[in-house]
Amino acid sequence: MSRIGKRPIPIPNKVTIDIQGQHVAVKGPKGSLERTLPDKVNVVQENDTLLVQREDDSRTARERHGLTRTLVANMVEGVSKGFEKRLSIQGVGYRAQVQGTKLTLNVGYSKPVEMTMPAGIQVAVENNTLVIVSGIDKEIVGNVSAEIRAVRPPEVYKGKGIRYSDEFVRRKAGKTGKK
């Protein structure tokens, strides 16, 4: 039995779950999410918890058991609390601005980099150097954050670039030269 897959998912108040075959819809105060489950895995609602069960012990069913449980748990957490990623911009003259759904990054290129945010994603900027990406879908929040970081990843000599706020960038010593 999958250690992750057999753990029950608690359903918070104000969250409703609609299960129709392999289709799961979760609605909460922050919004609603839908997902089609993979084959050989079922979700069962018991009182105020969800249980993910597999049909048999085949390899594919065991592979998908823990994955499905985590995906459904992320849906429940997303519609109740939401997800947030923080990115820090470091470097002289590097800054970010938000105009509606557009994020503009000035990170040392000849022209500013403009990014349009997908639906359901909110972006905020604090002090021109801290970008906060938030939304209800953990996968989209992570992908958008990775795209923003990829515009100018942190470099190892001076540490300039865009990094996650909790990321540690390993620094390298530069050339020492002849003496």
Swiss-Prot record:
InterPro entries xref list: Ribosomal_uL6-like, Ribosomal_uL6-like_a/b-dom_sf, Ribosomal_uL6_a/b-dom, Ribosomal_uL6_bac-type, Ribosomal_uL6_CS
Entry-linked PROSITE patterns: RIBOSOMAL_L6_1
A single GO molecular function term of this UniProt record: rRNA binding
One GO-annotated biological process of the protein: cytoplasmic translation
GO cellular component assignments: cytosolic large ribosomal subunit
Keywords, in A-Z order: Ribonucleoprotein, Ribosomal protein, RNA-binding, rRNA-binding
Pfam families listed in its UniProt record: Ribosomal_L6 (PF00347)
Function noted in UniProt: This protein binds to the 23S rRNA, and is important in its secondary structure. It is located near the subunit interface in the base of the L7/L12 stalk, and near the tRNA binding site of the peptidyltransferase center.
Family from the record: Belongs to the universal ribosomal protein uL6 family.
Complex and partners: Part of the 50S ribosomal subunit.
Name of this protein: Large ribosomal subunit protein uL6
Species per Swiss-Prot/TrEMBL record: Rippkaea orientalis (strain PCC 8801 / RF-1) (Cyanothece sp. (strain PCC 8801))
Organism lineage: Bacteria, Bacillati, Cyanobacteriota, Cyanophyceae, Oscillatoriophycideae
